[in-house]
Each structure stands twice: as structure tokens, then as C-alpha cells.
């Protein structure tokens, strides 16, 4: 397992976590075994916006004795009073739900307390007016909530809430379908979504990824907007390549599904190549690097995807990205303009010219 550091909290978080949308489907015995295997395999981050309330005692049974090794993100607004998932902006309901979750998880603290499911500005206004944000802040002062998160599918709302509140982690729906305008939660333009990634990277706000497979749509050739099924591994790699991403949270409910996720690190590079998405990217995305590294190997040894990522972040004002760029073994000035990458790029990026542009830009920064 590989890990990434949340710059705002210092937490060391596994690149692959577990979402709980259907954890309950494995039943107590099967799901407990799956969760124990996940932690044994190095997974340490778990989202608890569960599809059913029965997931919480499963987590409590499976992980209560491993609590100091894991992180929970718990949502203030998720209501399980009816048994299944519900959404509420009523403070009394939210308070009772969080207390119930903690009791069933057999824990007394929350690693990341989330401002839950804010998809419209009116949601945020009601959330604050009803005192739910104040509730989270009070619990943070008491040490019950360690850090504050936000879950949303809408770039404009995310930007507004990040302006208004101090956020340490964002839960955002990230996959190639949504990023290029296809799917139920494909909110915001390609550029607006990219701005969220870049802002989070710049400000040190980690992103945990929900819906990495677009609800399974991307795994089915008939449903996929790309006309071809992607694998779970391609979707995970795509998400991890976006700026700001700390962890991807696929669902799982049994050991077999967990083992399949853990096998991500055993895959050859070609199994992770998601460049097929170029078949359906919009015109405004053509000519823009998506860091897929389909252009590898570079004859001069450049990591073209990473060089592009640092450049995009630097232009967005991320000073740390400039320092990271300068520590690369080979940078844009080492490009020999052989054209190998230009001929291989499925997104029609003239990388040879771009390397000259990047080199000049980075050298201009003192």
C-alpha cells in the first residue's frame, strides 16, 4: 500500500480506502472479515456515508480494537433513524444520528467530521443557519472531532464553502466521465472541476474520492460514455493522478472485493493506462495534458505527466509545486524535441512545444 500525507493535518492516509455504500451486503461475518483484511493489507481510511445503518455495528465489531490505526470520516447530515440512509438538516436529528453512529462504531471520537452533501448554496446557508456547522466546531474544540471535511458534487458550492470555512478534507466525485461532462453527478465544466483539484492541492486540502467508477457505469461497455468498459484499476489510477487527491474510496463488502482492490499495486503499467477516455473528451479538453502518461517512455527520461502537473499547479499559484519540479531528476529543459510524446498523446498535446513553455516559465521564477 502507498500512502499520501494530508498537508493540513499530517495524517498518513492510504491511497486506497473503503467506501461504505453497500458494506452491509456482506452480512456481519463476511463484512467483518473484509474489513479486517483491508486493514491487514494497509488500508486505513474509511468513509461512513453508509447505504444502510447496519454497516455501523459491522465496523464496530471489525475495527474497534484497531481504532488507533485507522481514520473514519463521519457525516453530519447523514440520518439513519429509518434504518437506511437519509439526509437531514435538522440539528436535533443530526446530533442523535452522530451519537448513534459513534455508539455503534464503539468509538468516542471522529477523525474527520464532514459537512455533508452540500450541492446547492441554499444547502450551505441552511446548514449554517440551523447551527450544524457550529455543532461541528464545538465538537472540534472538545476534541471529539479532530478535523473538518466537506462532501459535495458541485464545484461552485465547494469554492464558496472553502471561502467561508476552514476545510481539511474534501470528498468529491472524481472519475473521467464526470470530469468530461457525462453522468448524474457531472456537475461543473471540465475547467471548473480542474480548478477545484488545483485549489485543494495549493491549499493542502486533501481530497477523498467518491464514485470513482461512476456508480459502476464505467465498468460496463454498454453504459460507459466512452463506448468501452474501463477497469477498476484504470479508474483508480485516473483519480490518483488528479491534483490534491489523497485516497480513492471504492465500495466493498467481502474479502474477494478487498483482495481485488489490494491487487491494484500488482498491475503492470499498461493495465492502468486510461488513455481510452480521449475518445469522448470535449473540444475544450483537447490539447490539455491529463497526466495519463500514455506518452511513456520518454527517450530522454522525462516524467512528462508529472512535469505538466507541477506546471499547472505552479500557474495556479502553488509555490510548493515549483520546488517539487526543481527536485525532478529530469525537467522540461532536458527535452530533446524528438516528438515521441507528440505522436503518442491521445489528447493531441504538443508536448515538445509545451516542454519549452514549461522550461521558460519555471526558469523565470526566482
Residue ranges and their predicted role:
Residues 39-47, 191, 195-366:
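Structured C-terminal cap/extension of enzyme domains
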Residues 1-76, 80, 141:
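N-terminal binding-site loop/beta-alpha segment at the start of enzyme catalytic domains
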Residues 6, 18, 46, 59, ...:
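Conserved, mostly hydrophobic/aromatic
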Residues 3, 35, 56, 60, ...:
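Generic structural signal for well-ordered alpha-helices
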Residues 21-23, 49-51, 75-79, 115-118, ...:
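Active-site beta-loop-alpha junctions enriched in small/polar residues
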Residues 26, 40, 86-208:
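Glycine/proline-rich, positively charged
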Residues 69-72, 166-175, 268-275:
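Short hydrophobic/aromatic-enriched beta-strand-loop microsegments
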Residues 19-29, 76-95, 121-125, 220-229:
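Active-site mouth loops of central-metabolism enzymes
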